[in-house]
From Swiss-Prot:
GO terms for biological process: response to pheromone; sensory perception of chemical stimulus. It holds the Pfam family V1R. It is found in: Cell membrane. This is Vomeronasal type-1 receptor 47. Disruption phenotype: Mice lacking all but one V1ra and V1rb gene (12% of the V1r repertoire) show a lack of chemosensory response to a subset of known pheromonal ligands and changes in maternal aggression as well as male reproductive behavior. InterPro entries: GPCR_Rhodpsn_7TM, Vmron_rcpt_1. It is a multi-pass membrane protein. Its main location: membrane.
């Protein structure tokens, strides 16, 4: 068994990882609950509410599945069979793909919302929510089809008699694929990453250009260099811009660490960094979204004041 199988002996790594997962589950649960309450109370939904609520649900499920898999990495376990290994790993990878698809479509939707009426993208505003939902479903089904090879390559470690497998957890391992299969799968994944991250970069650049143009117009109208009070649309755009930048950086770092891990199968340090980095975006994003909600900010502020005055 390789060095990764001894990760359960590293208490600091285990505590750090479960702390990250716990914070992420709490944040996404609160954000999802907020959107559910907002919906049932009859508040007029914004176009971005559906994808943000969907993203929080995806991240919540992904972190829960990650927590289950982590128990088999960091805690001594009796062992899972092939069916459990295949189901958990496939579900986790599918949820990660859904996260990427939804984040990309959210950036495109915000670019459409921000577009002035005279721009061609403004024509899609009325049906943007429906179109984005269809795009998310299509991309998700496509990615789940790409990941179907996991039903063949994931197996229970107890069934293995060779040493060149890739460690997933104490019970589950990834069998090496043939050169042709590995090349096809890698090509499809690269195309998916380039397409979706390319959409994010394009929509983000477009929104930055619109915000800069709007600020210049506002300064000309005011006749002063002082900035105007930020509009709700601009606040939402700035939030999504920050998330998109963060997501792209995390995706690049994730790819670098993942490639390094493929080259150094027995490096437990590389694997520890890999499993930590994979969940940073899912952990941080709900708190960034909640920071733009005035009702939530005021609620937390009053709670802090109440605790301080106790």
């Amino acid at each position: 068994m390789n060095e990764n199988s001894r990760l359960h002996t590293h208490s600091n790594i285990r505590n750090t990882f479960f702390s990250e997962i716990g914070i992420g589950i709490s944040g996404n649960s609160f954000l999802l609950l907020f959107h559910i309450i907002k919906f049932f109370r009859g508040h007029r939904p914004r176009l971005t509410d559906l994808p943000i609520g969907l993203l929080s649900l995806i991240h919540l499920l992904m972190l829960l599945v990650a927590a289950v898999i982590a128990t088999d990495i960091f805690i001594s376990w009796r062992g899972w069979n092939d069916i459990i290994c295949k189901f958990l790993v496939y579900l986790y990878r599918s949820l990660r793909g859904l996260s990427l698809c939804t984040t990309s479509m959210l950036s495109v939707l915000q670019a459409i919302i921000l577009s002035p009426r005279s721009y061609c993208l403004a024509k899609f505003k009325r049906k943007s929510s429906h179109n984005i939902s269809c795009a998310i479903i299509f991309l998700s089904v496509l990615y789940m089809s790409i990941s179907s090879h996991l039903f063949i390559s994931i197996t229970a470690t107890l069934n293995l008699t060779m040493n060149n497998f890739l460690y997933v957890s104490q019970s589950c391992s990834l069998l090496p694929l043939s050169y042709l299969m590995q090349s096809m799968y890698s090509t499809l994944l690269v195309l998916r990453e380039v397409f979706l991250i390319g959409l994010m970069v394009l929509s983000t650049s477009y929104m930055v250009a619109l915000l800069c143009m709007h600020r210049k117009q506002a300064q000309n109208l005011q006749g002063t260099s002082l900035s105007l009070k930020t509009a709700p649309e601009q606040r939402a755009t700035q939030t999504i811009l920050m998330l998109m930048t963060f997501f792209v950086l995390m995706s690049i770092f994730d790819s670098i660490v993942s490639s390094s891990r493929a080259m150094f199968l027995d490096d437990s340090t590389c694997y520890s960094i890999y499993i930590f980095v994979m969940h940073i975006y899912a952990t941080v994003s709900p708190f960034v979204f909640m920071s733009t909600e005035k009702h939530l900010v005021n609620f937390f502020r009053s709670m802090c004041e109440w605790i301080i005055n106790m």
